[in-house]
Structures are given as structure tokens and as C-alpha cells.
Amino acid sequence: MKLVLMGLPGAGKGTQAEQIVEKYNIPHISTGDMFRAAMKNNTELGRKAKSFMDNGDLVPDEVTNGIVRERLSEDDAKDGFLLDGFPRTVEQAQELENILSDLGTELDAVINIDVEKDVLMKRLTGRWICRTCGKTYHEIYNPPKVAGKCDLDGGELYQRDDDKKETVEKRLNVNMKQTKPLLDFYSEKGKLHNINGEQDIKDVFVDVEKILTSF
């Protein structure tokens, strides 16, 4: 089965990806892994990607699409794969269709782990870290016994800038704006399956399996 997995930060996409690839024995192909492999193997596209990244620039679609094409042409992806982090735009989605068409196949499904913004905010802004020992807590899922203090050494808990409300909200807004056209694109193609990501992790995977067993 050929799948694309989508979901905003905090939706639990990584957990579902692990379960899907383990149960269905397909490779988990993430954008980061593809770039790292291409650079490690010193491919022409890998060298191009590295030059852009070293300069702090975004890797252009031409290079990204080429790396995706190379990865999906490998033997382990012939019977299926789980794409994660690609495509990010409608243009990339259209190129993915071209790549798969050239390989004589097509996507089976796009799975979107759907979670409301306010729930994502609670998940993403709840992390606190002990200044002394580095132990991590979460206001909802793993709170300290005494607010603001580490259970182990009584150290002060602090919040990283990345976990602060303003930063998280900005990141989510950018992601939501980028993701909507892509969701619309796959919905019009009849490929999109929205999964309620606010359920228990096990129940989310039950819903994912219902989709995957319908092929």
C-alpha cells in the first residue's frame, strides 16, 4: 500500500507512523531521512540539497522532488511505503502523482490525523523541564507532584521558547495555512481520509486500520 500521512504538530502522527510501518511492513519515508541518506551517499541531488541547507536556504522543489523520485524507485518501496513530510504543497502533490505514474502505480490513501487547534495548543504548550536534571514534565499527561518543582530534586521547572504559547500558536497557524490547500487537493481526488486524533492512541490506530483494510 502506498500512503501519505498528514497531521499538524502535536497530532500524534509519529506514533501512528510507527504502528503502520510495523504492522504492514512498509518503509517509513520521511523528508528528513531522505535528505540525510542522499547527502550521506553523496548523490548529485544530495550534494545540491546540502549546498542549499548549508546556506540556510530552503531546498527547491526540483531537488526535493528528485530525491523523492530516487527514494520511491528503490526496491523496498515497490510494494508500498508511508510518506511523511512530503508533499507539503499542491505542486509537490502533483509531482508525486507524476513520479508514481512513471513507476506504474498511484497513491492508495492520504491519512490525516485531525486534531482541533485548542487541543494541539494544550498538548504542545504543556511541556516543562527541570533546570537541574533536565527531567521533562507535561501539565496534562505527566504533571509534577508540586507545581513548578521537579519530583526528583526539587529543581525549578522552566519552559523552552519553542513550547511557549505565542511560538506554538504561530507555528500552528503557518502549518494550518500550508496544509489546507493540500487537504482540499486530496479530498477532490477522493484519496483523503480524516481520522479523529483526539481519541486514545489505540483507538486512532483502530480507525487507521479500518481504512487500510478496505483496499
Curated annotation (Swiss-Prot):
Keyword ATP-binding: yes
Pathway: Purine metabolism; AMP biosynthesis via salvage pathway; AMP from ADP: step 1/1
Membrane-spanning parts: none
Binding site for AMP: 31, 36, 57-59, 85-88, 92, 160, 171
Region feature (LID): 126-163
Cellular component, GO annotation: cytoplasm
Chain residues that bind ATP: 10-15, 127, 136-137, 199
Protein name: Adenylate kinase
Organism: Listeria monocytogenes serotype 4a (strain HCC23)
Recorded name of the encoding gene: adk
